[in-house]
């Protein structure tokens, strides 16, 4: 099933993920949001076991339904390539750093 996106300012305007990405913002200035929420209750245990890139691919496949699995995998691999993160292996996309007890910061 293809997930469609609607404008927050015009619920009659419905686009595919690729159309919403290409357009950016609706003519009325609204944002494009999924027209329904996905229930990930059943998938949650397996999603929590995935590394960052595998999780990104799985989530994108759920929300970007008009892209192929290969297109999504290629985009994720390019976006999270080691050279974009100082060559670190494994890539530290969102490092968690300790700043005292019990303070941690998630770097985005």
PLM ranges: what are they?
Residues 1-108:
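PLP-dependent amino-acid enzyme catalytic core
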């Amino acid at each position: 099933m293809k997930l469609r996106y609607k404008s927050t300012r015009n619920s009659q305007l419905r686009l595919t993920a690729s159309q919403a990405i290409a357009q950016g913002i609706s003519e009325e200035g609204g944002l494009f949001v999924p027209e329904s929420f996905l229930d990930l209750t059943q998938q949650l245990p397996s999603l929590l076991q995935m590394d960052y890139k595998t999780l990104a691919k799985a989530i994108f496949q759920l929300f970007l339904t008009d892209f192929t699995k290969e297109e999504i995998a290629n985009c994720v691999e390019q976006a999270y390539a080691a050279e974009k993160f100082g060559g670190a292996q494994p890539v530290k996309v969102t490092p968690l750093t300790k700043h005292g007890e019990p303070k941690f910061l998630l770097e985005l």
